Design a protein with these regions (language model features):
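Acidic-aromatic/histidine active-site loop/patch
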Residues: 1-8, 163-168, 172-173, 218, ...
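Walker A (P-loop) phosphate-binding motif
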Residues: 2-39
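G-domain G4 guanine-recognition motif of GTPases
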Residues: 14, 149-150, 173-185, 204-211
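Phosphate-binding loop that captures ATP/GTP phosphates
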Residues: 31-90
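Cytosolic-facing regulatory segments adjacent to core modules
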Residues: 69-133
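Inter-motif core of Ras-like GTPase G domains
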Residues: 114, 129-151
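Beta-strand-loop-alpha "switch" segments that mediate conformational coupling across diverse proteins
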Residues: 181, 193-225
């Protein structure tokens, strides 16, 4: 069993199509290479894509887990996850989107507590809506990775979220500018982007990590960071992702140490 101090990391955005799910899956691959036991929670309850990307056929999902908790049938989170490989499991989004309406935010902290008892790293792929569930997720993770693109609406909406964080003295987050998603979209300079967000950009994923034939990997259920060809031709980009992965773990440890000292 993993340490009871498993790290909970959310990958979030305020707009769809910014590479959030891709980032979550790539991080899972990197943590697997670090010999970590990894759980990906697909918290995009209405249109989650983790199971599709990884080509897994899940029989259980997060709604079934919550239903068991609420009816005192819950035994272990392992009963509700689907394995991708020997070190990566997935807690899938509801198979029936109607079930998403029944998921209450109050269960999120319980799921996180159960998950960190079994896994070293728990990656939470959220949707882009700032609803009660997502706000609960952001409140209870160890660290958040906020994904933005060179898009004015995306940046202005992210600024609003960051302002909420600042007003509540929340500092456990990193901002990532993803330039690999839409390589022709470079309307705003880095200076402009910082001015709009009113904060620094912690990491930038360059357009060199644009994968033209990414659908091929999705159809094969492959994780980019575990693919030899991707590592060979995009070694610098993968190394940058690894730095992000390590920093997220360090940040989680810092938060845990602060909590223990209080």
């Amino acid at each position: 069993m993993a340490s009871s101090k498993g790290k909970i990391i959310s990958i979030s955005s305020v707009k769809g199509g910014v590479g959030k799910t891709t980032m979550a899956i790539n991080l899972a691959g990197l943590y697997f290479m670090m010999k970590k036991r990894v759980l990906i929670i697909d918290a995009d309850f209405y249109s989650g894509g983790i199971s599709t990307w990884l080509d897994i056929r899940n029989q259980k999902d997060i709604y079934m887990m919550i239903d068991s908790i609420s009816n005192n049938r819950y035994s272990s989170i392992i009963d509700y996850v689907t394995s991708y490989n020997s070190g990566i499991d997935v807690l899938a989004s509801p198979k029936d989107p109607r079930s998403a309406l029944k998921i209450e935010a109050k269960y999120i902290p319980m799921i996180f507590e159960f998950a960190k008892r079994e896994y070293d790293v728990v990656l939470v792929d959220t949707n882009h809506l700032m609803n009660e569930v997502n706000l609960m997720i952001l409140d209870h993770v160890d660290v958040s990775l906020l994904m933005v693109t060179n898009d004015l609406i995306d940046l202005k909406n992210m600024r609003n979220l960051i302002q909420i964080f600042k007003s509540t003295d929340k500092t456990n987050y990193f901002v990532v500018l993803n330039c690999s998603r839409d390589t022709g979209r470079d309307y705003l300079s880095l200076f402009d982007i910082r001015n709009i967000l009113k904060c620094n950009i912690d990491y930038t994923i360059g357009n060199s990590f644009y994968i033209k034939n990414i659908d091929k990997y999705v159809l094969n259920g492959e994780i980019l960071t575990l693919n030899r060809s991707v590592n060979r031709f995009h070694g610098g980009d993968v190394a940058k992702l690894k730095k992000i992965a390590l920093k997220l773990l360090e940040s989680g440890e810092e938060e845990s140490e602060q909590e223990e000292s209080n």
